[in-house]
């Protein structure tokens, strides 16, 4: 992505760059809480106590539309989007509220994720390592007020979880 951005810039193409982040929908595809051997719901992500920026997939297009509607305002700029910034503990609390059952956060390391053997584990661990290593920058460039201005329908994660709670695989 970064390499392609350089081509647009070098050619002088009037461009706005849109940076996305971790999709809420990943929680529907195995990244959400799982029951441990004791039946407890556990959310394990390799993010320690850092904040993660997250967004609903459908909000990406709606935010891009908001950028287009502003005409030249964002040409040559980067718009980094998110709908929520949250720590692992905050994510677990949102899952608890949505599911009506206690979810605990147990961080794992990126090395543990890489070694998990899950499909795509190495790539996902690398992504989380970047998110974690650059957490302050990564969440800092994602101005939730600006994104909400561009997309008034922007969904915070807690709202999205409530709407999709029955789709989240827990076992």
Model features per residue range: what roles?
Residues 1-104, 113-120:
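Oxidoreductase cofactor-interface core, primarily capturing Rossmann-like NAD(P)-dependent enzymes
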Residues 106-108:
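NAD(P)-dinucleotide binding in Rossmann-like oxidoreductases
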Residues 110-171:
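A hydrophobic C-terminal alpha-helical subdomain
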């Amino acid at each position: 992505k970064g390499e392609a951005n350089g081509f647009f810039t070098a050619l002088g193409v009037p461009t706005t760059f849109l940076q996305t982040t971790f999709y809420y929908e990943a929680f529907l595809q195995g990244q959400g809480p799982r029951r441990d051997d004791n039946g407890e719901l556990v959310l394990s992500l390799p993010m320690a106590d850092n904040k993660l920026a997250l967004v609903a997939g459908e909000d990406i297009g709606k935010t891009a539309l908001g950028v287009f509607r502003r005409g030249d305002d964002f040409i040559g700029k980067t718009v980094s989007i998110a709908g929520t910034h949250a720590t692992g503990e905050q994510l677990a609390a949102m899952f608890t509220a949505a599911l009506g059952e206690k979810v605990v956060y147990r961080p794992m390391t990126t090395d543990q994720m890489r070694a998990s053997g899950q499909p795509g584990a190495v790539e996902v661990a690398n992504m989380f390592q970047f998110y974690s290593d650059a957490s302050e920058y990564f969440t800092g460039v994602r101005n939730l007020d600006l994104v909400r201005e561009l997309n008034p329908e922007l969904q915070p994660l807690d709202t999205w979880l409530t709407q999709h709670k029955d789709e989240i695989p827990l076992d």
